[in-house]
Curated annotation (Swiss-Prot):
The keyword Ribonucleoprotein applies. It comes from the Bacteria. HAMAP family: Ribosomal_uL29. One of its GO terms (molecular function) is structural constituent of ribosome. One of its GO terms (cellular component) is cytosolic large ribosomal subunit. Belongs to the universal ribosomal protein uL29 family. One of its GO terms (biological process) is translation. It holds the Pfam family Ribosomal_L29. Disulfide bonds: none annotated. This is Large ribosomal subunit protein uL29. Keywords: Ribonucleoprotein, Ribosomal protein. SUPFAM superfamilies: Ribosomal protein L29 (L29p).
Length: 64
């Protein structure tokens, strides 16, 4: 889990790279869930929230 304050210290390029990684993680978790291999279902919502945090910080930085 990431803190929004930690994310605000990163550049937009770093945030975009992190966002891509999180989206890949989310896709892999969804595929594991679909095939019945996902043992830790809480990871889906955790990654979803992390994606939202990164997008929020990116939008805040774009507005400045």
């Amino acid at each position: 889990m990431m803190k929004a304050n930690e994310l605000r210290e990163k550049s937009a390029q770093q945030l975009n790279e992190q966002l891509l990684g999180l989206l890949r993680d989310q896709f892999n978790l969804r595929m594991q869930k679909a095939t019945g291999q996902l043992g830790q279902s809480h990871l889906l919502s955790q990654v979803k929230r992390d994606i939202a945090r990164v997008k929020t910080v990116l939008n805040q930085q774009a507005g400045k």
